[in-house]
């Protein structure tokens, strides 16, 4: 849990912005969204494999684009 100490003469908006940023860095909202509904382990594995495959395809496409000549 991110803890923010409000500095002297610091406005509420600035302190709230700092708190939101620290929550974002800690990944709290992403964790809450992922745990909102139960997801079967097979579904989790399937989703992770799909993201891995997409990332790999993107990397290969970048490599191929770098190796092709533009003339």
Curated annotation (Swiss-Prot):
Gene Ontology molecular function: any one: structural constituent of ribosome
Keyword ATP-binding on entry: no
Residues forming coiled coils: none
InterPro entries with a match to the protein in the record: Ribosomal_bS21 (IPR001911), Ribosomal_bS21_CS (IPR018278), Ribosomal_bS21_sf (IPR038380)
Keywords from the named record: Ribonucleoprotein, Ribosomal protein
Signal peptide positions (record): none
Alphabetized Gene3D superfamilies for the sequence: Ribosomal protein S8
One Gene Ontology CC term in the entry: ribonucleoprotein complex
Cysteines paired by S-S bonds: none
Stretch list, region Disordered: 47-71
Gene Ontology terms: biological process: translation
Ranges of Basic and acidic residues composition bias in the record: 60-71
UniProt xrefs under NCBIfam families: S21p (TIGR00030)
Family classification: Belongs to the bacterial ribosomal protein bS21 family.
HAMAP family attached to this UniProt entry: Ribosomal_bS21
Protein name: Small ribosomal subunit protein bS21
